[in-house]
């Protein structure tokens, strides 16, 4: 199961008692700020959660799995996420009892 933006908006509606439309707009606005920062080359740091970074990957050799043909994989910029220590600790604590 995955947490969706709609579920986040519903949670805001239930916990803060704000209008559903406003809650949806808040969630959309939050993610739009992250998108815009990354598009302009900025790192996004969310204290207690983690960091979104941009990383440039060089061109590298690859192989078409169907034909076995060698093909170059283009250089590109990718978004990476590094969870913060608080998030790591909480996830580990939550999962330690499930084994």
Curated annotation (Swiss-Prot):
Keywords: DNA recombination, DNA-binding, Transcription, Transcription regulation, Translation regulation. One of its GO terms (cellular component) is cytosol. GO terms for molecular function: DNA binding; structural constituent of chromatin. SUPFAM superfamilies: IHF-like DNA-binding proteins. It holds the Pfam family Bac_DNA_binding. CDD domains: IHF_A. One of its GO terms (biological process) is regulation of translation. Residues 49-71 are annotated as: Disordered. Heterodimer of an alpha and a beta chain. This protein is one of the two subunits of integration host factor, a specific DNA-binding protein that functions in genetic recombination as well as in transcriptional and translational control. Belongs to the bacterial histone-like protein family. This is Integration host factor subunit alpha. It comes from Shewanella frigidimarina (strain NCIMB 400). The gene is ihfA.
